[in-house]
């Protein structure tokens, strides 16, 4: 069976960057990695209703900079930004180091209908609320295409509708080239915990192609090549008159 690689992992280092950006030695690497996992879990739990798509972390030995990408900036900031101090305190408790300097930057997602994580979370929430999994997917696809996406693909799997046997159903609209590395594919997973069991939700959204300036400038130019007439030698042979064969002289 063919195995499908993660579209995000395939493009990291090509057109996408890492969610955690730092360098550490062997002893600190494991410690910082576990801290990043705990920080993300704690912040996602605290900001459950704030439509948070992604949390990126940059750090040095003395400082941690956290970027929270959300569609609801006001909910994350709170009144006059009071919620930021609460989140900084939560990070200090999570990592167990109050001396570490923590900075939190909130980044607004201007088009939430084309963000794969937010779309997947919306589908999962509506499935939990007993909405039809087919109509929920169709509505999400309609909104994404209207918002400017070039293509979208959705998939839900599990005991859909409470049936005994689990199955997978999904829809696709537009172009979603998963094997083209220059295409910007946003991929996300979400889980819906229903009374019948767990239902998985996957969303792929194509936002177009990302090309470097060099590739864009040279792509319009037509390649130069020399025209060669491979039949020239054969034509010359045809035009030439056939050589007369020498006639053997009769012996007297």
UniProtKB/Swiss-Prot annotation:
<dbReference type="InterPro" id="IPR004087">
    <property type="entry name" value="KH_dom"/>
</dbReference>
<dbReference type="GO" id="GO:0003735">
    <property type="term" value="F:structural constituent of ribosome"/>
</dbReference>
<dbReference type="GO" id="GO:0019843">
    <property type="term" value="F:rRNA binding"/>
</dbReference>
<keyword id="KW-0687">Ribonucleoprotein</keyword>
<feature type="domain" description="KH type-2">
    <location>
        <begin position="39"/>
        <end position="110"/>
    </location>
</feature>
<dbReference type="InterPro" id="IPR009019">
    <property type="entry name" value="KH_sf_prok-type"/>
</dbReference>
<dbReference type="GO" id="GO:0022627">
    <property type="term" value="C:cytosolic small ribosomal subunit"/>
</dbReference>
<keyword id="KW-0689">Ribosomal protein</keyword>
<feature type="region of interest" description="Disordered">
    <location>
        <begin position="218"/>
        <end position="252"/>
    </location>
</feature>
<feature type="compositionally biased region" description="Basic and acidic residues">
    <location>
        <begin position="219"/>
        <end position="252"/>
    </location>
</feature>
<keyword id="KW-0699">rRNA-binding</keyword>
<dbReference type="InterPro" id="IPR036419">
    <property type="entry name" value="Ribosomal_S3_C_sf"/>
</dbReference>
<dbReference type="Pfam" id="PF07650">
    <property type="entry name" value="KH_2"/>
</dbReference>
<dbReference type="GO" id="GO:0003729">
    <property type="term" value="F:mRNA binding"/>
</dbReference>
<dbReference type="GO" id="GO:0006412">
    <property type="term" value="P:translation"/>
</dbReference>
<dbReference type="InterPro" id="IPR015946">
    <property type="entry name" value="KH_dom-like_a/b"/>
</dbReference>
<comment type="subunit">
    <text>Part of the 30S ribosomal subunit. Forms a tight complex with proteins S10 and S14.</text>
</comment>
<comment type="similarity">
    <text>Belongs to the universal ribosomal protein uS3 family.</text>
</comment>
<protein>
    <recommendedName>
        <fullName>Small ribosomal subunit protein uS3</fullName>
    </recommendedName>
</protein>
<dbReference type="Pfam" id="PF00189">
    <property type="entry name" value="Ribosomal_S3_C"/>
</dbReference>
<keyword id="KW-0694">RNA-binding</keyword>
<dbReference type="InterPro" id="IPR004044">
    <property type="entry name" value="KH_dom_type_2"/>
</dbReference>
<dbReference type="InterPro" id="IPR005704">
    <property type="entry name" value="Ribosomal_uS3_bac-typ"/>
</dbReference>
<comment type="function">
    <text>Binds the lower part of the 30S subunit head. Binds mRNA in the 70S ribosome, positioning it for translation.</text>
</comment>
<dbReference type="InterPro" id="IPR001351">
    <property type="entry name" value="Ribosomal_uS3_C"/>
</dbReference>
């Amino acid at each position: 069976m063919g195995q499908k690689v993660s579209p995000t992992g395939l493009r990291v280092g090509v057109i996408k960057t890492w969610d955690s950006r730092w360098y550490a030695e062997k002893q600190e690497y494991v410690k910082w990695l576990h801290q990043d996992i705990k920080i993300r879990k704690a912040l996602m739990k605290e900001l459950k209703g704030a439509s948070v798509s992604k949390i990126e972390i940059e750090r040095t030995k003395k400082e941690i900079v956290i970027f929270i990408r959300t569609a609801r900036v006001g909910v994350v900031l709170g009144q006059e930004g009071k919620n930021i101090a609460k989140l900084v305190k939560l990070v200090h408790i999570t990592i167990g180091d109050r001396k570490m300097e923590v900075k939190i930057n909130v980044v607004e997602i201007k088009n939430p209908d084309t963000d794969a994580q937010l779309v997947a979370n919306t589908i999962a929430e509506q499935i939990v609320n007993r909405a039809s999994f087919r109509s929920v997917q169709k509505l999400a696809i309609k909104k994404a295409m209207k918002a400017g996406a070039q293509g979208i693909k959705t998939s839900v799997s599990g005991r859909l509708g409470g049936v005994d046997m689990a199955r997978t159903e999904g829809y696709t609209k537009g172009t979603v080239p998963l094997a083209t590395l220059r295409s910007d594919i946003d991929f996300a997973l979400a889980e819906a915990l229903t009374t019948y069991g767990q239902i998985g939700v996957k969303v792929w959204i194509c936002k177009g192609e990302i090309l470097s300036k060099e590739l864009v400038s040279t792509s319009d130019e037509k390649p130069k090549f020399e025209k060669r007439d491979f039949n020239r030698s054969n034509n010359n042979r045809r035009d030439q008159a056939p050589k007369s064969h020498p006639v053997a002289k009769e012996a007297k």
